[in-house]
């Protein structure tokens, strides 16, 4: 390798572009070839002449001249001597910037280990040689010997313990063995030289073969792990062409001097880079060692010097990694080469990813209400500086100045010509504004500058929310785009009038807020006794004249002609109507403007205009809206006065009554009727209830005050500022406050801010206020860090193709919580592509085929058809090899169109999730710590009509009450019939491939009905383990059941309440199986009533239904037909309903068609919200076990009844398990283990009957929710951390069986129907949530705790994980009112799943247990299968975002994220290639990024120009 010459790339010969970047180990020869000379002296510069010393660290001969084209001694100056070497000083005459790239080297006297390969786990040198890191260090630091050749040496005299190669010996062992066996070839040495020789002598190929044999033969897992570690290192050396001995340094490279500068400060001092100090120590020690060796010094001294040299080199590469860090003059550790590149201040993040740029400036912002949407006000002073070069050119071009110098003078003097030219330059040159923190793409937008006087930038009020800016002193930065392409992109893509929709949710972001909302709201209000009320006007113009002449109030109700129709409206609303744009197709419907316009309504209006009119129309409309809002907010003269804050009279009586009720509860507690937690819960409930009552009264008062024109009410109601919760604090009562730990203080603040707080109340308030401020400060950092991790994991996701061709998808339904709709199916399916046909449940025809993109109209059609679940394509199921495809992503929410290839969807997703994170954290203190607890649920109520079906539900009867005895796997369903049996017969159910056939066999006939398999509710959905049941089919019979004619055999589930999520154990059921549930049925459409009866699976028309009839048969439907005789709506009329119209009557949408006959059964079940009862399953006699007063239970005396009750202590001695045992007549023993704080309701030896309550356990105390749970919860989910108390989850469906405990752990066995079983050992401290003999589904929790996402993936698969993660993450954001589209979370989740774990390596190069990216896995398997080999098998793994980002395929991207040294160590040994496919690595290398318009770089682009 001696022919390697010094390389220097001349400026013009630099490669303009390169395909890939590879990191390798440098061989000693390569280092020498890079070098321009050896650095022999530790000197830097001469302190008198300030010239660099020769052969020193800054030597000009080695590194190049200090001044351009000038040698050191001054013999050659000027450009004409370029390339000449001065004979006197040896310096080449060239530019001084070669000092940034020329390297030197130091020849070390002894080989030294590179600390990264010794100390970075796993230690690469140690792994290769198969010795421990500690031992390796002892050898390198001259504390121990390593055996180089064992010869025939033995440790003992019997010659049984052989000395092996690479054994590490201490001094005594070495001396002994050396004396005995030196003749027989024994040899051992210490230090870097021996390690280098051993590495050089390794035969990697034979080691590889040997390891592969070992791994096959060993059974121990631990051994396998170590072998695999070693295999990986050996393989990477073999594949990369690196040699192991290169990990030892013989030639130490010296960094170019301009990268470790030495700057002189005033006062004769110097600022020196730490690296120079570290190099000086290496050179000093190296020279001393050389001298000592020449002098033949004693071994011990030389050894010591060698050790010091090793330490000096260690400190240079990574100071403080091993021993104590080397400190400088000022007692702080010196910054080594590793520290220079890593961390926030390191090379990557400080200088490569975040550079300061020219042509930028910053200033304070003020509001610019007169600007257009796409304009910003730029101070002349700033513009002058920013556009200086443009200005100089323009002045010369126009002939005002002849030289640059003259032009500069003109600019300094600010002559009139300068201003004239500046106007011209700025006229068509957009600028970009940025507000830090730049959390999403809307934080940088382009504007056309308008030159203004003053020093502050003016910002359009509507773009404030996108920037999250306000005018309380915020600053913004201005950047000037320079190239033509950049200017074009600013105008086409980044102009603020183009960024109207938020990429996170597709909602408009430039919506009027605050004053503007207030103005428009005021304009749209109605007033009863106003001037000119109830008049009729001929046209809109006439109305305007009347208003201007003061003959008509803005708020008066009037009648006028609008677009050829008579409309009841007000003058104010007509003014709003006058600014609405003329849309080509569908003009804005009257219902959108002829009403009180609150913030939501204005947002909907903007959305509508955008969807139907496009960008330009919307931008113009928004400006008009802004002007209108400001104008009328000013005219309205709304202000706050103390008189607006009205305190209801009834407040004081409510508070007194509450105090009385609290006293009663305290007395009950004092007499032992209640447990402490029950007392606490009840008190908190009373005050919450009182607060709500007072608030309701107060809102009623304020709402009616000044007939709706109360200033405070207007502000809150319009959505301009404030909320009901805040008005409640002003005029109602402040309510309950929370402590910093989230628990509620039971003493409420009964005063409000108008009355003022007393000292105690003020003190209680400080808790919340202080917590708010502290949280804000802490969480902003967390949210920023989360964003950074998300960006890093998703930065390589871009749209790479139109369609990946997959048929897979994920089923989605509407999201409800406790029966309340959270997000409708319509919203969720909007902008997605179907992965399966959508079939109309009523007509069974295909509405939309697979591959259809769902827009607003189609989404509406889907919900109108009553479809409850749709299967859509998602990024998680996308099969594109890199990134995602357009179809799986759906629409780009920022544009509202299908996403185009090249869009950086990963970055958009990460920003969309990260950006609200900071808002979440900032949102805690707005409620000022006021506790928010809802009152507990006590019952479930039916919202729909139909009849009841029990699914697996078992009940006990006790005193004519029916008590639920199931703890799981049961439900009460509300259904309507879908298919009725046409005759008596036997039912048979067959499962075909995708279908289910329901067959009824009668005496002579047979009929078959075909259903789609996935339309049927699955058992785990019915049990509430996963998914939704609404809209699915239910078959209440099993194979072989007999059915009667007209009995319903297939039903549609309308509502489902499962046990235990919706109906707790031991609830009282109020409806029997088969009971009808009736409601008032509203028509819902205008049209003709037609009655039908269900026969088999079709509807048969019946005409004999009359008003007043009572329905007695299952299967009566009413259809309302519209003018074209098409079905508009269909309703099921249950039994016990009274019909209110005759057949073929005409009805309107608000008519009630049918009513319940009596006060219908609406309550399905009810229960005690505060405690969970323990119920006797059978009658028998009670016996106590481990229940001893004063030991495991305490006695609580009840004065009112004179009885005492036993309550289990909160903390029990270990091994004590208070239990009630019931022995039945048949001699069976039933055991009930009681939890702490349980109150016992039966005496020892008492007789109990079935379903009696024997004890009650209080439910846990409610803590008020705060986003503190939010942000940590989100990062916990994205990091895929296992929660502290992970729930143990059933892995298979089956029946629970308790086995005898093992080592004080409970043993649970699940027996599946096919005979397989799974066993779980559960710690005694955990609460077990299953009972013996119960049936559980895979994925159900067996113990308390949070579900770990890893378990979900392992047991239920990727789609279940998708459902779980998205619903958990969305829950946090929704609780804060933040809308984020699911697809963003899906992109991140798909990145967390981008690696797989090899289970079986087949014929591939993978090793079992390896984690590889899916892409590598697919490529390798394709390669093996092409040559006819066995492919590898892998299982999906879930990685947290940090792990996933560090495991990125790109070296540069991973290194710039975290754990830089580790990433670089691994990459250099494996000689990894980085193909520069993604964003981050290209930013770092300063290339065009390969997304968006960057995709078309170097391609020819045709541009079409629209003539119009």
UniProtKB/Swiss-Prot annotation:
> What task does this protein carry out?
DNA-dependent RNA polymerase catalyzes the transcription of DNA into RNA using the four ribonucleoside triphosphates as substrates.
Q: Which residues bind Mg(2+)?
A: 470, 472, 474
Summarize subunit and interaction data from the UniProt record for this chain.
Answer: The RNAP catalytic core consists of 2 alpha, 1 beta, 1 beta' and 1 omega subunit. When a sigma factor is associated with the core the holoenzyme is formed, which can initiate transcription.
Per UniProt, the keywords (alphabetical) are: DNA-directed RNA polymerase, Magnesium, Metal-binding, Nucleotidyltransferase, Transcription, Transferase, Zinc
Reactions performed catalytically: RNA(n) + a ribonucleoside 5'-triphosphate = RNA(n+1) + diphosphate
Q: Which Pfam families match?
A: RNA_pol_Rpb1_1, RNA_pol_Rpb1_2, RNA_pol_Rpb1_3, RNA_pol_Rpb1_4, RNA_pol_Rpb1_5
Enzyme type, top EC level: transferase
GO BP terms: DNA-templated transcription
Cofactor annotation: Mg(2+); Zn(2+)
Family, according to the entry, reads as follows:
Belongs to the RNA polymerase beta' chain family.
What are the recorded GO MF terms, alphabetically?
DNA binding; DNA-directed RNA polymerase activity; magnesium ion binding; zinc ion binding
- HAMAP family in UniProt: RNApol_bact_RpoC
The note describing how and how many cofactors are bound reads: Binds 1 Mg(2+) ion per subunit. Binds 2 Zn(2+) ions per subunit.
Protein's name according to its UniProt entry = DNA-directed RNA polymerase subunit beta'
| Binding residue positions for Zn(2+) 1 | 71, 73, 86, 89
Q: Might you report a single GO cellular component term? A: DNA-directed RNA polymerase complex
Instruction: Supply the gene name.
Output: rpoC
Q: Which CDD domains match?
A: RNAP_beta'_C (cd02655), RNAP_beta'_N (cd01609)
Give the top-rank taxon of the lineage listed in the UniProt record for this protein. Bacteria
Q: What NCBIfam families does the database record attribute to this sequence?
A: rpoC_TIGR
> What InterPro entries does UniProt report for this protein, alphabetically?
DNA-dir_RpoC_beta_prime, DNA-dir_RpoC_beta_prime_bact, RNA_pol_asu, RNA_pol_N, RNA_pol_Rpb1_1, RNA_pol_Rpb1_3, RNA_pol_Rpb1_3_sf, RNA_pol_Rpb1_4
> In the Enzyme Commission scheme, what number(s) does this protein have?
2.7.7.6
The residues that the entry says bind Zn(2+) 2 are 804, 878, 885, 888
Report whether Cytoplasm shows up as a keyword of the record. no
């Amino acid at each position: 390798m001696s022919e390697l010459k010094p390389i220097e790339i001349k400026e013009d010969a630099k490669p303009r572009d390169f395909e890939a970047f590879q990191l390798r180990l440098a061989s000693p020869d390569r280092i020498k070839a890079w070098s321009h000379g050896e650095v022999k002296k530790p000197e830097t510069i001469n302190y008198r002449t300030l010239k660099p010393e020769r052969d020193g660290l800054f030597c000009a001969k080695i590194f190049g001249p200090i001044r351009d084209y000038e040698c050191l001694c001054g013999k050659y100056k000027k450009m004409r001597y370029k390339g000449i070497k001065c004979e006197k000083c040896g310096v080449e005459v060239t530019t001084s910037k070669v000092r940034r790239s020329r390297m030197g080297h130091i020849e070390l006297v002894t080989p030294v280990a590179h600390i990264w390969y010794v100390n970075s786990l796993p230690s690469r040198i140690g792994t290769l040689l198969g010795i421990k890191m500690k031992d390796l260090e002892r050898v390198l630091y001259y504390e121990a010997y390593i055996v180089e050749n064992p010869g025939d040496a033995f440790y003992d005299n019997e010659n049984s313990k052989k000395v092996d190669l690479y054994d590490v010996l201490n001094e005594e062992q070495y001396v002994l063995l050396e004396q005995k066996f030196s003749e027989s070839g024994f040899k051992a040495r210490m230090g870097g030289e021996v390690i280098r020789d051993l590495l050089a002598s390794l035969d990697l190929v034979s080691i590889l073969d040997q390891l592969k044999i070992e791994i096959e033969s060993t059974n121990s897992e631990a051994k396998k792990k170590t072998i695999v570690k070693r295999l990986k290192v050996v393989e990477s050396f073999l594949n990369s062409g690196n040699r192991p001995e290169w990990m030892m340094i013989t030639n130490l490279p010296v960094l170019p001097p301009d990268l470790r500068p030495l700057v002189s400060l005033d006062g004769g001092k110097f600022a020196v880079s730490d690296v120079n100090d570290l190099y000086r120590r290496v050179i000093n020690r190296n020279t001393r060692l050389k001298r000592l060796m020449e002098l033949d010094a004693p071994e011990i001294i030389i050894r010591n010097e060698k050790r010091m040299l090793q330490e000096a080199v260690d400190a240079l590469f990574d100071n403080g990694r091993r021993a104590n860090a080397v400190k400088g003059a000022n007692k702080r550790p010196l910054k080594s080469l590793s520290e220079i590149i890593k961390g926030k201040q390191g090379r990557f993040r400080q200088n490569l990813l975040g550079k300061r740029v020219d042509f930028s400036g910053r200033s304070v912002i003020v509001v610019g209400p007169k600007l257009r949407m796409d304009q910003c006000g730029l101070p002349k002073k700033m513009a002058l500086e920013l556009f200086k070069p443009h200005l100089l050119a323009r002045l010369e071009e126009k002939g005002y100045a002849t030289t640059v110098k003259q032009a500069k003078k003109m600019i300094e003097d600010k002559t009139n010509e300068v201003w004239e030219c500046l106007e011209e330059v700025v006229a068509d040159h957009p600028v970009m504004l940025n507000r830090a923190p730049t959390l999403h793409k809307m934080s940088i937008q382009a504007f056309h500058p308008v030159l203004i006087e003053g020093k502050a930038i003016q910002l359009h009020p509507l773009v404030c929310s996108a920037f999250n800016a306000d005018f309380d002193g915020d600053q913004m930065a201005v950047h000037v785009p320079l190239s033509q392409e950049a200017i074009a992109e600013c105008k086409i893509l980044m102009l603020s009038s183009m960024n109207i929709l938020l990429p996170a949710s597709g909602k408009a972001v430039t919506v009027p807020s605050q004053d503007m909302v207030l103005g428009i709201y005021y304009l749209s209000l109605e007033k009863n006794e106003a001037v000119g009320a109830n008049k009729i006007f001929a046209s809109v113009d006439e109305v305007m004249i009347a208003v201007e002449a003061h003959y008509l109030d803005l708020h008066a109700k009037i009648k006028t002609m609008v677009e050829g129709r008579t409309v009841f409206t007000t003058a104010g609303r007509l003014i709003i109507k006058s600014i609405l744009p003329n849309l080509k197709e569908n003009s804005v419907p009257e219902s959108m403007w002829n009403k009180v316009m609150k913030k939501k309504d204005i947002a909907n209006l903007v959305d509508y205009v955008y969807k139907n009119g496009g960008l330009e129309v919307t931008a113009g409309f928004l400006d008009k809206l802004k002007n209108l809002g400001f104008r009328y907010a000013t005219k309205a003269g709304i202000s706050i006065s103390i008189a607006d804050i009205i305190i209801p009279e009834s407040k004081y009586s409510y508070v007194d009554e509450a105090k009385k009720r609290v006293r009663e509860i305290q007395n009950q507690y004092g007499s032992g009727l209640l447990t402490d937690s029950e007392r606490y819960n009840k008190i908190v409930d009373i005050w919450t209830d009182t607060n709500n009552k007072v608030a309701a009264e107060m809102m009623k008062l304020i709402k009616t005050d000044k007939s709706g024109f109360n200033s405070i009410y207007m502000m809150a109601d319009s959505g301009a500022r404030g909320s009901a919760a805040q008005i409640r604090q002003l005029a109602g009562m402040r309510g309950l406050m929370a402590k910093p730990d989230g628990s509620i203080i039971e003493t409420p603040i009964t005063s409000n801010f108008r009355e003022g707080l007393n000292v105690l109340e003020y003190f209680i308030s400080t808790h919340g206020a202080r917590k708010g401020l502290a949280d804000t400060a802490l969480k902003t950092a967390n949210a920023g860090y989360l964003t950074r991790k998300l960006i890093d994991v998703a930065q390589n996701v871009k749209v790479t193709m139109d369609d990946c061709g997959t048929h897979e998808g994920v089923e989605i339904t509407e999201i409800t919580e406790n029966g309340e709709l959270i997000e409708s199916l319509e919203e969720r399916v909007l902008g997605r592509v179907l992965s399966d046909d959508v079939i109309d449940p009523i007509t069974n025809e295909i509405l939309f085929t697979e591959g259809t993109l769902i827009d607003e109209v189609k989404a509406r059609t889907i919900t109108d058809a009553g479809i409850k679940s749709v299967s859509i394509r998602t990024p998680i199921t996308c099969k594109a090899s890199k990134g995602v495809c357009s179809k799986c992503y759906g629409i780009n929410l920022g544009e509202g169109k299908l996403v185009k290839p090249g869009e950086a969807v990963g970055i958009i997703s990460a920003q969309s999730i990260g950006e609200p994170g900071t808002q979440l954290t900032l949102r805690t203190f707005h409620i000022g710590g006021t506790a928010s607890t809802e009152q507990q649920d006590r019952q479930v109520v039916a919202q729909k009509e139909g009849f009841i079906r029990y699914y697996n539900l078992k009940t006990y009867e006790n005193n004519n009450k029916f008590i639920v005895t199931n703890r799981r796997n049961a439900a009460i369903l509300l259904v309507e019939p879908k298919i009725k049996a046409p005759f008596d017969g036997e039912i048979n159910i067959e499962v075909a491939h995708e279908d289910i056939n329901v067959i009824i066999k009668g005496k002579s006939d047979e009929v078959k009905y075909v259903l789609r398999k996935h339309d049927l509710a699955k058992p785990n959905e019915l049990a509430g383990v996963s998914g939704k049941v609404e809209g699915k089919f239910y078959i209440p019979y099993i194979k072989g059941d007999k059915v009667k004619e007209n009995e319903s055999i297939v039903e549609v589930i309308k509502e489902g309440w499962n046990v235990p999520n919706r109906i707790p154990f031991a609830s009282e059921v109020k409806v029997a199986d088969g009971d009808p549930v009736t409601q008032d049925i509203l028509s819902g459409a205008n049209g003709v009533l037609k009655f039908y009866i269900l026969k088999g699976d079709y509807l048969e028309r019946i005409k004999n239904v009359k008003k007043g009839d009572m329905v007695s048969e299952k299967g009566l439907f009413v259809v309302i037909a519209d003018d074209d005789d098409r079905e508009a709506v269909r309703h099921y009329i249950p039994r016990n309903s009274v019909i209110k119209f005759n057949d073929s009557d005409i009805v309107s949408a608000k008519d009630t068609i049918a009513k319940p006959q009596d006060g219908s059964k609406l309550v399905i079940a009810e229960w005690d919200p505060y405690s969970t009862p323990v119920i006797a399953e059978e009658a028998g006699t009670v016996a106590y076990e481990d229940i001893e007063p004063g030991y495991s239970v305490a006695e609580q005396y009840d004065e009112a009844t004179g009885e005492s009750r036993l309550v289990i202590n909160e903390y029990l001695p270990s091994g004590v398990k208070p239990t009630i045992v019931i022995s039945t007549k048949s001699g069976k023993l039933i055991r009930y283990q009681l939890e702490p704080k349980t109150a016992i309701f039966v005496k020892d030896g008492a007789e109990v009957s079935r379903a009696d309550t024997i004890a009650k356990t209080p439910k846990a105390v409610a803590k008020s929710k705060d986003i503190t749970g939010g942000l940590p919860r989100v990062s916990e989910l994205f990091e895929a951390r296992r929660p502290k108390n992970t729930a143990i989850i059933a892995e298979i469906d089956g029946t629970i069986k308790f086995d005898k405990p093992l080592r004080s752990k409970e043993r649970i066995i699940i027996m599946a129907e096919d005979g397989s079983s799974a066993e779980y050992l559960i710690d005694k401290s955990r609460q077990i949530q299953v009972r013996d003999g119960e049936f559980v589904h895979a994925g159900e929790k067996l113990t308390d705790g949070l579900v770990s996402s890893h378990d979900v993936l392992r047991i239920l698969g990727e789609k279940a994980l998708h459902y779980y993660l998205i619903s958990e993450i969305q829950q946090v954001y929704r609780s804060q009112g933040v809308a984020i589209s699911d697809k963003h979370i899906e992109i991140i989740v798909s990145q967390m799943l981008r690696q797989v774990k090899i289970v079986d390596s087949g014929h591939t190069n993978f090793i079992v247990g390896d984690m590889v990216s899916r892409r590598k896995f697919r490529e390798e398997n394709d390669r093996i299968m092409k040559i006819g080999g066995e492919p590898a098998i892998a299982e999906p793994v879930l990685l947290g975002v940090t792990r996933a980002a560090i495991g990125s395929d790109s070296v540069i991207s991973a290194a710039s994220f975290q754990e830089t040294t580790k990433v670089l160590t691994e990459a250099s040994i494996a000689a990894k290639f980085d193909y520069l496919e993604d964003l981050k690595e290209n930013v770092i290398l300063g290339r065009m990024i390969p997304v968006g318009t960057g995709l078309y770089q170097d391609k020819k682009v045709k541009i079409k120009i629209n003539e119009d």
